Amino acid sequence: MNIFEYFKKKDIDTVDASFYRKIAEWDSWYRSNVRKFHFYRVYGGQGTWTRCRRHSLGMAKKVCEDMADLLLNERVKITIGDATTEDFVQDVLRQNNFMTKGNEYQERKAAKGTVAYVPYLADAEVDDQGNILNGIVKINYLEAPNIFPLSWENGKV
């Protein structure tokens, strides 16, 4: 059973599977590996064909890299009005290697259509009243094939 069959069985409405086929197509362009473009056959005579791979400059990847470098680079500064909050956020971003991973995932966003940065609390301790005593804020980085929106309203997931 694939994920879409599971969603259907549980009566969960999500993005149609055809969208994920498009993501796979975009990824093949990004990797310079489009089946009907980068691969072709050459007739060798006497009924023989040779399968060939077209050379590529990898321009789709280059465009995605350039887009990512414009969006998230060393000149980008994330600022918050409150100094204490800004220090905390900067520390979380540094601990999660955000400038490097964020740029890498901006490239993947340009290639596949979307990415998600998912913050979560690791190694958390909770008291009897449900208050969080401590923990480490971490960030999961997800790319389009691993994102399945379960609900959205007015464009917000």
Show where each model-derived region lies.
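Extended, helix-rich architectural segments
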Residues: 1-142, 147
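Short, intrinsically disordered, charge-balanced linker/junction segments flanking boundaries
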Residues: 150-157
